[in-house]
Every structure is written in structure tokens, then in C-alpha cells.
């Protein structure tokens, strides 16, 4: 890939304003590369290229042909897995082992949607005599994808992979904080045979390139993953052109632990659910609600686990890497400062290793106990490695606490009681409920999305293909 350029119409092109943005390594706070600063004219060129591809070779390709291209792309990603992981680790600060898992997930997304491309179909509907009625699913046309900095490869894979499988041409605006891996994948896509213009990448700031994409009249669908505040702006901009939007926003996801749960099985999952990616995960299990009878012993065990966590540079491959930037680091500090001021006890915290650069954006994982349900630590998304522990007396209180935020992305339930498992799964306000696990290993086959302030629409799995298509009804009268 070429530094400080966009990928438009199958070529590396300079930004219209010839300006760049520094790429900073979160592990030491130092710039190590540059990207192009895209603006509205760059988005205009990218949309035009996508329109040409949709009207030309990509739009004319059969579903089977699209699937074969995506399968080749999956193989290319797998062949370059270590390279992509190294790029992602340095760009985001995440430990190399996590970046490696993200690259493997990217390959799997392309593999899954390659196989699904020719399985998407409409229906024949029963109707009155003399008519044949059927539905067909057609691609929207040109789809816009605004990709966040926390999981660039994974979210690119689940969003763009599904859109391409459905026959759309794509314009992608990755986050300026972490977009190098996405640019490399665009290059691999061209090598895999994706026609020029079917995939276009414009880098830049959200308020410039992102806003231009969201309000562009040539976009037929927008997929956005990010904060609720920005998601609201994107939806408003898209509404100017009556463009449908898939929003995957924040979360304040609870894990409910009952006294009959297998605590040995739950413990490492409760920790990893908030520590993974430094807590910078929309579905992070940031609240643990514990039944009163086992609250003290479980909090004690959690504290022991947290005290053993180590934080360091991405290359050290420890439990946590740095946060993405100084702004995010300050946000986490502000939450912890408010908690301390309000007398919320910190039960434990991890350790930043001694050789971590002082200029890096480090934050040790923190466990806070007895967090009041109304406190901002229990209500707002921290987006950092901070776990809020709370207690409950019975199921009703557990559900009240779990549903007591504006969010509704993920919930976890830990209990051996089968009746309780299904009863609570139906009562919890969340797009995903995991029972005696959390995340189900991140399977690409599982539809993912939220309710409330966590957004709407679904990505991942076969369900995502419906969002990237428009349903058309055809009624034929005979005789």
C-alpha cells in the first residue's frame, strides 16, 4: 500500500487537498506513518467509482462469481495473516495475539460471505387465483461504511464482506486513528480479482470525510459503528437523502452471576470480557451483577485476577495494550476520578509494566465494587478496562439492574438453572444474550446488533445480507 493516499477505482490516489494526518503508535505516543486527509471531493470521486463498478462489471457479476472473489480474498488474508496482525497491533496498540485473532476473523468473514453469496433468495407467495407473486432481493447499489478504530479488520470484514456478497459496491471511511490494516486489505482485494471501484477507501477525519460520506446523495445505504452521539449525527445526515442506516453503537453490558453458577468457569470470562482490547469494545462486559450470597467471595476472586493483570506495549503481547489515544486515556481517568471522589471503592487494579514507554497511553484494568446503579460508572460507557461490580437479591432486581441503562447490546447469564436461563433471556433488553459464556467465541455466523442507544439493524451472520439488500415484490397476472 502507498502511504498518504486513498484507494479509489483500484488505484492509489492523492487527496484533493494534498494534506496528511499523522499515524501515532499508542504504545509510545510517537508518529510512525501518515495517511491522506480526505475531504468531500475525495468522497465524490470514490462514490463515482463505486457507481461505475455497480453499473459495470461488479453489478453484472453473478452471485457465484462474487462468492469466488470473496473466497480468494479470504485466502489472501489468511496468507498475509501475520503481516496484517503486525500492522493492526502497532496501529491500535492491542496485543499481537489479539490482532492475530482479528486477522483470522477477517478471513473467516470473507469465507462465510463467500459461501452465502449465492444462497440469498426471495420467496414465492400464495395469493389469489390468476396471480403468481414472488419477491426478489436486490443490492442497494453503493453502500457507505464508517469503520471504527477498535476493531478495524473485524468490522470491515463483517460490514464490507456482507455488502459485497449481496452485490453492492462499497465506499469505506475508516477511523483516522487506525486504518492501515484496512488499506492493506483493499490491496489484497484487488489482487483477489475484485473489480476496480467495487471497493474504495477514503481516509480522513470523521467531521470531514465521514460527514461527506454520510450525507452524499449517491450513497444508498450507510453502515456505522461507533459512539451513540456520532451515530445520531450519521443517521440525521443520511436522513437528508432518505438513506437506510445500520447503527452498531455503544453498550453497558451486564453479566448476571447467580449463586448456583459455576464460578470457576465464570471467573476468567468475567475478566476477559472487560480486559480484551483494553475494554475498548462495544460489547465489553463492563458490569458484573452478582447475587448477594456469592458477592463477597466472587469479588475477592475477581480482585486477585485483576491484581495479576499486566499492561504493556503491543509487541510485549501481555494482557492489555495501551488505549488508542490520549483523549481516550483521559476519558478513563475522568471516570475513575469521579468514582474516587464519590467514595466508590477500588477493589483491585492491574499493573503497567516498568518498561512501558511513559509517552504511551496506558491504563491498568480496574475493578470497582459496590457501584451505585445511578452512578455514571454504572450508566455510561467508559470504553476502557473498568469493571463495575454490583449486587442483587433476586431475579427481579437483577433484571431491573441489567435493563437499567439506555443501552441494550449484550447480556450474559451465569446459572445452572435451565428454567431461569430461558426466563431471563427473554426478560433482558439486549440484542444478544449469552448463557454460561460471553460472546460464544465471536462466531461470524451469529447476528449482532442492539436495541435502544445501542443502535438498530444487524450485522454478522446471514441476517446481515438482508440489511444490504432491498426487497422487491413482483406480481404477475395470468390470462
Regions found by a protein language model. Give the residues of each.
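A structural signal for short, well-ordered beta-strand elements
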Residues: 22, 36, 59, 92, ...
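Hydrophobic face of amphipathic alpha-helices that form TPR/SEL1-like repeat modules
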Residues: 1-28, 34
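ALDH superfamily catalytic-core signature
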Residues: 229-372, 435
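Structural signal for hydrophobic packing residues in well-ordered secondary-structure cores
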Residues: 54, 58, 74-81, 85, ...
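Residue-level signal for inorganic ion chemistry
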Residues: 29, 66, 88, 110, ...
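Conserved C-terminal structural/oligomerization subdomain of aldehyde/semialdehyde dehydrogenase
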Residues: 28-34, 256, 310, 355, ...
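Rossmann-like NAD(P) dinucleotide-binding subdomain of oxidoreductase/dehydrogenase enzymes
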Residues: 122-265, 317, 392
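Glycine-rich loop-to-alpha-helix module at the N-terminal edge of alpha/beta enzyme cores
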Residues: 33-120
